[in-house]
Structure formats: structure tokens, C-alpha cells
């Protein structure tokens, strides 16, 4: 059993390493719905947030308190009142909000202070700091409704928050703001988190919500044919949002989506809607290729491009397992660095998941495609075909008639994509001299002109 565990753990941990490097030093604003805390999810969320901070991420945590305030209002015999999806905060509601905020901040700080041995928080030294970082203004009267002590964010103390983050602390914000005259306003977690993310130009805005994400057809019921859309380019998200009814409660598809769109339009690279009821969803989204929930991004994260010298380490990491098992011929770092411009790569969120190299033989009007590799984590998603097509385009643009590959294990994959098997004697003289007759690679050719 220990050997099996170790065997599974090592490749998984290696696959996570690129994301650890990618996110180190980045700033994430995380909004946790009050419903998550009411559902008893705070302890696990605190552990996950402590973990990502220990790996170098700067975290701003904004908590909600909608159900907690409602519970206190009902206990006092008052019915919670809303309009346009926003609470109408009278004097009683303001008192309840202040009391709920104080209690939740106490619980959150306590969760980050636990460090018992043999627990996920063992040895952690998480400093949680709060402050009057939000200046607010009143909502006022909208469509004849006086929102009283409900407010909107007027200004974010960016310098103060960054100073606290650079000190190594996690910033904790309640959905409260104060006017220049000292008047308190009840805000929403979603608006505070979005405003802070925009002001900081954070790398990520993340909502831990009660919904699993945005479905491809939001108005249709859950089904196998209507799964969660894991990645929404900003333009698609805007179009989708325009066709959704105005949200009145957190379970509405547009409730979080509107804030994600706003953040991405104003400089936040990526915004996420994650389900808090899935244990570890925050870690799955940040440190896995496919993630969980829905991400709104201002451009398609996955890019197909030619490699540069900066990509050498990523290419080496991708092809190394295939060199070890004999699928690929071993190449030295020096060779790959020298030939970096020959490679085409698929990069997703800063990590290389597929590559191939093109080595022309102009005198024979052909070129070798070498080191075609797709990460096991994304195989079966068409990345191999995309890289192959790019190599074909590059060969055609160079005025060549064909491309060829040498393979010992993947002949049928190439045959299905238009390659024909030929004798090794077909190879250009310069390549034939380097042919390894002991390896006995199959030679396959495809016309591109």
C-alpha cells in the first residue's frame, strides 16, 4: 500500500509544481459567501487558504453574512427586506449586520489561529489583519425605495491593503464601509470583493458560492448535455449575461457572473465562481489544469504559439517522462535551447501542455516533425491535432511539400491523420545518416502542399 500511495503521489505533485511557481507572488481576492460559513465550511476553507498563502500567494479575504444577518433579524421579529437583490438596511438591520460581522470576524480569525499537531494547520503562522480600507457612500433612493444604511464602495485604500499584504499578512474584510463623516454602511460581499480586486488589479477574483458554476445553458436544468462551462471568454460571458434576467438572489446565474464580468472588464485577468460545497474546490481550481466551477477570462487562456528560449524549461519538463519510457529520443537542454525556435507549443495559464518541433530539409522540400508530445493530463482533448496542424502550416509557409515523422509506438495515430508509411531509404540524405537502425523507427510522410 505505501508503495502504491507514493507512486500516485509523486507524479501528481510534479504536475502541480508549475502552478505553484506560476502563482507565487500573485494577489488573489477571495469572496466567501455567508452561506458557506453557515454550512460549516469555514474550517476547510481556512485550511486551503492557509495552504495557498504558504505557497506565496497574497490573499485578501472578504466574507459575506447574508444568512447570519437574516437569522438575527428573524430572531428579533423583523422580516429581512430586499429590493433589486440588495438588502434594505434600516437601523435594526444595521445593528444586526454589525453584530454578525463582529461574530464572523472572530470565527474566521480563530480558524486561522489553529495550529494543533497532526492537523493541516500545524506549524502555520497566518497573520490576519483588518482595517478601515473601504470608504463607502449611500445607495440612496432607487425606484422610490430608500435603502437607508445600505451602501456602495466609493474608494479602496489600495496602498494600505498592499502594505499589509507585503508584510506577509492575510487581509480580512467585512462587507462594511464608512463615509468620510464616519457613518457606517452595509455593503455586499460581492461588490466589496470586486471593487478590491479591481483596485489592486488582482490576478484572480474568486467567489466561493452556493452554485457549482455557470452552465452552458443557464436557464435549462442540470443534465449531462448541460454541463458547467469551465472557461468563459469575456466576450462570451458578456453576451450570456445580457440574456439572463436580473438576479435577485445568490442562486441566480447572473448574481456572481455580473461581478466576474465587471472585474475582467476593468483589469482583473481571471474571475472564478466555485462551489463551496465541494471540499477542496479552491485548490482544484488553482492547481489543476481543468479546475472546477467557471472561470471568466479576458482572453482565451490556451494559446498555440512558437516557442522562445524562455520556454525551454517547460518543454524539458513536458517531454522528460516520454524520454524516460523510450517514446521519445532523449534531447539535452542545450539542444532544446539551441532549437527553441523550431518548437510550437500549446500553453495554458502559463504552463506548456503540448509541443512539437519542425526541422526543415529544404533541399528535399520536406521537414521532420519531432518531439510531438501532449501532457497526459490533457490527452484526448485535441491538442495533438492542433500542434500537428500548426506544424503543417509552418512547413507549407516555408515552401515545403511534406513533413515526416519517425516513431516506434504511435504509428496508428499518424496513419489516421493522413500519414503514409515509407521505407527509411526515403529519408533525405542528411537525415538518413543520423537514422538509428537499432531503434528501427517507422518513417511516416504526409503531404502539406
Which residue stretches match the model-derived regions?
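Short amphipathic alpha-helix that is part of the acyltransferase structural core
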Residues: 229-231, 299-330, 440-443
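Nucleotide/pyrophosphate-binding catalytic subdomain
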Residues: 1-270, 309-314, 347, 360
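Conserved N-terminal entry element of GNAT/NAT acetyltransferase domains
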Residues: 287-309, 449
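Conserved acetyl-CoA-binding loop-helix of GNAT-fold acetyltransferases
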Residues: 374, 380-397, 405
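Terminal amphipathic helices with adjacent charged low-complexity linkers/tails
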Residues: 66-69, 278-282, 290
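A conserved beta-strand-loop-helix scaffold within acyl/acetyltransferase catalytic domains
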Residues: 330-374
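Conserved catalytic-core motifs of GNAT/GCN5-like acyltransferases
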Residues: 404-406, 415, 420-443
Amino acid at each position: 500500500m505505501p508503495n502504491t500511495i507514493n507512486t500516485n503521489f509523486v507524479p501528481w505533485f510534479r504536475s502541480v509544481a508549475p502552478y505553484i511557481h506560476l502563482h507565487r507572488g500573485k494577489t488573489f481576492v477571495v469572496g466567501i459567501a455567508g452561506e458557506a460559513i453557515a454550512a460549516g465550511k469555514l474550517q476547510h476553507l481556512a485550511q486551503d487558504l492557509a495552504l495557498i498563502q504558504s505557497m506565496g500567494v497574497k490573499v485578501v479575504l472578504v466574507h459575506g453574512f447574508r444568512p447570519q444577518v437574516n437569522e438575527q433579524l428573524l430572531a428579533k421579529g423583523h422580516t429581512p427586506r430586499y429590493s433589486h437583490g440588495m438588502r434594505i438596511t434600516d437601523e435594526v438591520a444595521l445593528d444586526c449586520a454589525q453584530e454578525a460581522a463582529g461574530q464572523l470576524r472572530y470565527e474566521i480569525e480563530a480558524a486561522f489561529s489553529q495550529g494543533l499537531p497532526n492537523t493541516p494547520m500545524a506549524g502555520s503562522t497566518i497573520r490576519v489583519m483588518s482595517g478601515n480600507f473601504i470608504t463607502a457612500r449611500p445607495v440612496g433612493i432607487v425606484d422610490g425605495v430608500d435603502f437607508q444604511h445600505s451602501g456602495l464602495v466609493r474608494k479602496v485604500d489600495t496602498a494600505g491593503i498592499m502594505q499589509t499584504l507585503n508584510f506577509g499578512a492575510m487581509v480580512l474584510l467585512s462587507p462594511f464601509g464608512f463615509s468620510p463623516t464616519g457613518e457606517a454602511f452595509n455593503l455586499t460581499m460581492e461588490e466589496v470583493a470586486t471593487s478590491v480586486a479591481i483596485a489592486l488589479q488582482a490576478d484572480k477574483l474568486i467567489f466561493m458560492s452556493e452554485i457549482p458554476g455557470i452552465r452552458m445553458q443557464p436557464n435549462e436544468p442540470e443534465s449531462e448535455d448541460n454541463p458547467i462551462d469551465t472557461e468563459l471568454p469575456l466576450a462570451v460571458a458578456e453576451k450570456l449575461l445580457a440574456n439572463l434576467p436580473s438576479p435577485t438572489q445568490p442562486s441566480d446565474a447572473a448574481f456572481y457572473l455580473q461581478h466576474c464580468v465587471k472585474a475582467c472588464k476593468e483589469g482583473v485577468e481571471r474571475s472564478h465562481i466555485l462551489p463551496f460545497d465541494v471540499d477542496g474546490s479552491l485548490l482544484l481550481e488553482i492547481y489543476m489544469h481543468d479546475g472546477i466551477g467557471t472561470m471568466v477570462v479576458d482572453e482565451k487562456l490556451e494559446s498555440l504559439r512558437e516557442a522562445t528560449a524562455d520556454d525551454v524549461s517547460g518543454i524539458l519538463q513536458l517531454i522528460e517522462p516520454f524520454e524516460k519510457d523510450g517514446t521519445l529520443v532523449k534531447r539535452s537542454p542545450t539542444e532544446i535551447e539551441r532549437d527553441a525556435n523550431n518548437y510550437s507549443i500549446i500553453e495554458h495559464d502559463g504552463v506548456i501542455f503540448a509541443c512539437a518541433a519542425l526541422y526543415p530539409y529544404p533541399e528535399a522540400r520536406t521537414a521532420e516533425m519531432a518531439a510531438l508530445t501532449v501532457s497526459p493530463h490533457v490527452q484526448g482533448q485535441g491538442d495533438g491535432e492542433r500542434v500537428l496542424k500548426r506544424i503543417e502550416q509552418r512547413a507549407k509557409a516555408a515552401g515545403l511539400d511534406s513533413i515526416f515523422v519517425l516513431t516506434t509506438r504511435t504509428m496508428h495515430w499518424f496513419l489516421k491523420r493522413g500519414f503514409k508509411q515509407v521505407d527509411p531509404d526515403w529519408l533525405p540524405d542528411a537525415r538518413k545518416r543520423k537514422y538509428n537502425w537499432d531503434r528501427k523507427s517507422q518513417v511516416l510522410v504526409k503531404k502539406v502542399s
